[in-house]
């Protein structure tokens, strides 16, 4: 699948360094690797200065630290964070994007709080009711954008329609697809299947001449290159994503066991190492970490809360790519023409 051409212009990304499950060390190590591999990249680590400076040791010319007095906890209600955590690492990282000191933000923190702060600080596209979490997942012959993955557990037909618009525009921006195939995730392919909101959204998309809507797909189609954009509500999407990640992890573990259990298995594994290596790389969820908060007028990437160094590095790369491809501007330019 062709991808959007990235111009290697200077980029600054703000990172919420304190909110992930694994602490700041993972973020700092990923940040150091990110600036090593990309000379055009500068990073702003937002968090407790003393802790970050200790982890950075001698520092780096393209990594600076911005002090944050507070941290949003994973179990904190978004409404509480919005009222009481305005000086948190998450809120300050987003404020740097709003103020033009950074072009994008990465956080492994509380998803609901990130959405709430994003809507409050960076603002939404005009006409978009709710943001959506979108992610590129590997498929049989390419990759597929799936959204929403947990921002909104209840979505109306209008919400689903708007997710489809944003997903289609994102696929065009990132993968340079002129007519990405857009589908709704459902319990069957027949028109009568699904709840009322899904059926109504299907009718709305079928009436939209500028969207290449192909109808319903089932969960088993997500990885089969049937569609380029798959739309669902956040409840369904999050379960589908976590199930896929769980199956991938299981397959990786089973393969490792099969090729280490016996002398014969080790011999076969040695012969198959190049093929197995590529397969494991494709299935490894940490290599595909980083979901986009679509609907916000800026690049905001949600990392998995339990991300390791490799996964955090993938999220930083995703933020850089979206900034360099000007994804928010490209979506915003065309949304007005597509809105009902």
Swiss-Prot record:
<keyword id="KW-0443">Lipid metabolism</keyword>
<keyword id="KW-0444">Lipid biosynthesis</keyword>
<dbReference type="GO" id="GO:0005737">
    <property type="term" value="C:cytoplasm"/>
</dbReference>
<keyword id="KW-0963">Cytoplasm</keyword>
<keyword id="KW-0594">Phospholipid biosynthesis</keyword>
<dbReference type="GO" id="GO:0006633">
    <property type="term" value="P:fatty acid biosynthetic process"/>
</dbReference>
<dbReference type="GO" id="GO:0008654">
    <property type="term" value="P:phospholipid biosynthetic process"/>
</dbReference>
<keyword id="KW-0808">Transferase</keyword>
<keyword id="KW-1208">Phospholipid metabolism</keyword>
<comment type="subunit">
    <text>Homodimer. Probably interacts with PlsY.</text>
</comment>
<comment type="pathway">
    <text>Lipid metabolism; phospholipid metabolism.</text>
</comment>
<comment type="function">
    <text>Catalyzes the reversible formation of acyl-phosphate (acyl-PO(4)) from acyl-[acyl-carrier-protein] (acyl-ACP). This enzyme utilizes acyl-ACP as fatty acyl donor, but not acyl-CoA.</text>
</comment>
<dbReference type="InterPro" id="IPR003664">
    <property type="entry name" value="FA_synthesis"/>
</dbReference>
<dbReference type="Pfam" id="PF02504">
    <property type="entry name" value="FA_synthesis"/>
</dbReference>
<comment type="similarity">
    <text>Belongs to the PlsX family.</text>
</comment>
<protein>
    <recommendedName>
        <fullName>Phosphate acyltransferase</fullName>
        <ecNumber>2.3.1.274</ecNumber>
    </recommendedName>
</protein>
<dbReference type="InterPro" id="IPR012281">
    <property type="entry name" value="Phospholipid_synth_PlsX-like"/>
</dbReference>
<dbReference type="GO" id="GO:0043811">
    <property type="term" value="F:phosphate:acyl-[acyl carrier protein] acyltransferase activity"/>
</dbReference>
